[in-house]
UniProtKB/Swiss-Prot annotation:
It is an enzyme of class 7 (translocase). The record marks 363 as: Required for activity. This is ATP synthase subunit alpha, chloroplastic. Pfam families: ATP-synt_ab (PF00006), ATP-synt_ab_C (PF00306), ATP-synt_ab_N (PF02874). GO terms for cellular component: chloroplast thylakoid membrane; proton-transporting ATP synthase complex. It is a peripheral membrane protein. It comes from Thalassiosira pseudonana. Its main location: plastid. The lineage of its organism: Eukaryota, Sar, Stramenopiles, Ochrophyta, Bacillariophyta.
Amino acid sequence: MINIRPDEISSIIREQIEQYDQDVKIDNIGTVLQVGDGIARVYGLDQVMSGELLEFEDKTIGIALNLENDNVGVVLMGNGRQILEGGSVKSTGQIAQIPVGEAFLGRVVNPLGAPIDGKGDIASTETRLVESMAPGIISRKSVCEPLQTGITSIDAMIPIGRGQRELIIGDRQTGKTSIAVDTIINQKTEDVVCVYVGIGQKASTIAQVVNVLDEKEAMAYTIIVSASANDPATLQYIAPYSGAALAEYFMYNGKATLIVYDDLTKQAMAYRQMSLLLRRPPGREAYPGDVFYLHSRLLERAAKLSDALGGGSMTALPIIETQASDVSAYIPTNVISITDGQIFLSNDLFNSGIRPAINVGISVSRVGSAAQTKAMKQVAGKLKLELAQFAELEAFSQFASDLDEATQKQLARGTRLREILKQPQNSPLSVAQQVALIYAGINGFLDNLAVSDVKKFSASLIQTLASQKSYIDVVGKTNQFTEEAETLLKEAIASTKTGFATL
């Protein structure tokens, strides 16, 4: 027979009564009126905030974007196939935020901060709002430190400073992503945290970027945020903001960060798709009226912080894809007006074998010159002018048959300078190496070399300097092109030249 112990039963009941929670929990619940194309119309959520996260019955999360008289327009962060008409929707009382922290370095995540690289969960205790305010005027400091890309033509003529926004713009397949990836690889010795945001890219393209960064040991200081072409438009729309939130964590902790948005054209397209489905009035090229604000609020988050806030920085390299080199289209002109300069990549230059295919004539850096190293300023001061004059003369020389000697010399030097600025992919150069090559070209040391030998000479000179070390040490320590450095460089050029036939 079972022995019943009343004292035990009464103690359990007493414990249950003590733990009883009398609080009444009120949930704000609505009903799905309509769902499809990544959009849901919800009735009954009168208390919802703009931008608030909503949870559907199948655990899909959505963002309330349109607050109308009789319903709420919600964009879905999943495929929404399990959401049914008449189903319930619960407001969460939260705005979109993602986990952040050091543990994200070396990982590939989606725009919600969830890992997608199969390497397990990411341990994180901190979160940041996906859409947070940009630093104000007092919180900022003017750009004063260089961010070396390792690409000679950029560091010499279109210098980028830490905290700057420099647009990379050009047609498809002109090497835009390559410039951004090379810049990330070049930060290996610079203690810069990098974030690469792939928006609407093919998954294979993002996998290729991850592989290149892995090979070059750059993943150790890089975070990849991926919203590929098969992800919902909502994820493609918030991906850049999520990337900015991850970079901001490091920036506010006093570190230098670099963020690449590849590319903002596809983000604008995703936003246009969402806006049209939400029945917002279309404007120019069917984009909604606030597409300028879409990009300006994102790019304003890049800054060089004041010393009082730790002196961290976020440098942004947004990428824009043009159609048939049309820089005057809506999205390109918007982003050009927001950024502090642009690097324009030309299809014609790319096809003629000049890579990186940078059109120096219409590329500009508005604030970077203040951050350029003194050594580069001393040597590359007249490089842009030389190349501009050369381009003009080259166009003229196609029509003129007999050219005077001075013009022929200028054309010969320009051709050799252009050869020096050609650079293979994934092989960034240090400042000292760049200074050496430009010095050799601009001061006529290559004028009597065959054009076909210039590339080989450049490679040999870099090897010679690497074996001697003294020149690289002088420029590296002082960041100036001193008389001692010039003497050492002249000796290296002379010894390298002995292995080449002169004209």
